[in-house]
Each structure stands twice: as structure tokens, then as C-alpha cells.
């Protein structure tokens, strides 16, 4: 019953008009009025921001803020996979040969997430990792490894919450939400970086258009907090053992080791 009511309320409020109004407000000068309150409520680390709080003219500018030079370091070990974002480590685990994985008691289909069987097949038996970005986090997304970009594509139309309630009561938000996917071939092995849109503000802006990408290079940004899913081929990585669900991650921090490079 609780799940049914939750989904009904989300459907009633999560329309194109609502998203349009919220997006327009966030991009307007009027939104600057609530920037101080927003920064206080979400405890934004102002010492790391590229500009002072009063220099951001709109909420959108604050959402998509850059960091001061040198505030994040990228692990340079050739064998390392690094966190592509600042966020909370939600979960990781095996992708079944059926091209599915379980998180928070919910089964997700890689076929649904990536849009077709052919794309999903290369990740059967592989590993998934999920990182959640809250409204307080730095919202820019960087590459977790170096390689050649093989494909970029967008799927889904609407987005549902990806917070704790959304993950428990929502309808597979990680594979159903609006999402932007970048696939990278690194030394013959594939990784998919799935950028999952957040409810209401359904926007993911791509910044990287070249055919190659370097580890730590900026690729895109969310206009609000959301979630990143990483998919790796079978026998490609070993997740850092110390990583725990709920742990805070910083951009550039090592989260896994390339098995072929050990």
C-alpha cells in the first residue's frame, strides 16, 4: 500500500510543467534570494567553491559550480579506477549472467538500463557500482578511467527520486529514469558510465565530445543531485575492499583496481 501511494504521489507531481517551472526558476535571478538558505540547509562547503557564494547569480549556477584548482587530486596509478564524482557510495556487486543485479531489494535489468540486449551482453558476469549525489555535493562528473569513447546515448523521458525512499518504493529508477550513457573502451575492456537524472530537474549536460578521454577529465554535470551507475565487464575490476555502503567519496579517489594491470 505504501509503495502504491508513493508512486501515485510522484506521478501526480512529476510532470513536464512542474519540471519546466522549477528549471526556469532555478535559472532566474529571482532564485538568488534563496541561495544563502540553500547553502546553509545543505551545508555546502564554501571553502572549496571556485567563487564566493554571493557571486552566484542563480541557483543553477550554484548547482553546477566548479571547485577551486587543486581541491581534488586524481589517483595516478595506472591500475586504478577512480570515483567520477563527489558522492555517497551506495552499493556494488556482481552483474548476473542474466544481465541483472540487485540493489536495495530491487532487481535491475542491464538491458533496460542500456536500451538493448547487445549493449548489455558485454557486462554479463561483470560488476556494478552505484554512487549517489545529494543536493549538497559538487555536481560535475569526471571519467573514472582513460580510454576511447565508443558510444554516447540518452534514454528515458521522466525521472523519479533516487534517494532512499525512491530506491525502496520507486519503479526501478536507475534503469527507468532519464539517463545519459557514455561507454568507454579501455585497453579492450568496456565500462559504461550511466548518469541518472533526478526528479523534476531532468537535466544532464554533456561537456565532453572528443573520441578519447583521460582519467579524471570532466565529462558532464547534473543540474541537481542524482546518481551515477558504473558497469564493468567480467573480470575487469576488483572493488576496493574498504569501501562501505554510505561512505562519502571524493572525486579522484581510488574505488577499484584493474585486474589486467595488477
Swiss-Prot record:
Single Gene Ontology BP annotation: phosphatidylethanolamine biosynthetic process
Top-level EC class as recorded in UniProt: lyase
Modified residues (Pyruvic acid (Ser)): 226
Cofactor requirement: pyruvate
Site (Cleavage (non-hydrolytic)): 225-226
UniProt-annotated catalytic positions: 86, 142, 226
Record organism: Bacillus cereus (strain ATCC 10987 / NRS 248)
Keyword entries, A-Z: Cell membrane, Decarboxylase, Lipid biosynthesis, Lipid metabolism, Lyase, Membrane, Phospholipid biosynthesis, Phospholipid metabolism, Pyruvate, Zymogen
HAMAP family, alphabetized: PS_decarb_PSD_B_type1
Entry EC no(s): 4.1.1.65
Subunit comment: Heterodimer of a large membrane-associated beta subunit and a small pyruvoyl-containing alpha subunit.
Post-translational modification, as annotated: Is synthesized initially as an inactive proenzyme. Formation of the active enzyme involves a self-maturation process in which the active site pyruvoyl group is generated from an internal serine residue via an autocatalytic post-translational modification. Two non-identical subunits are generated from the proenzyme in this reaction, and the pyruvate is formed at the N-terminus of the alpha chain, which is derived from the carboxyl end of the proenzyme.
Family: Belongs to the phosphatidylserine decarboxylase family. PSD-B subfamily. Prokaryotic type I sub-subfamily.
Classification via InterPro entries: PS_Dcarbxylase, PSD-B, PSD_type1_pro
Catalysed conversion reaction: a 1,2-diacyl-sn-glycero-3-phospho-L-serine + H(+) = a 1,2-diacyl-sn-glycero-3-phosphoethanolamine + CO2
Name of protein: Phosphatidylserine decarboxylase proenzyme
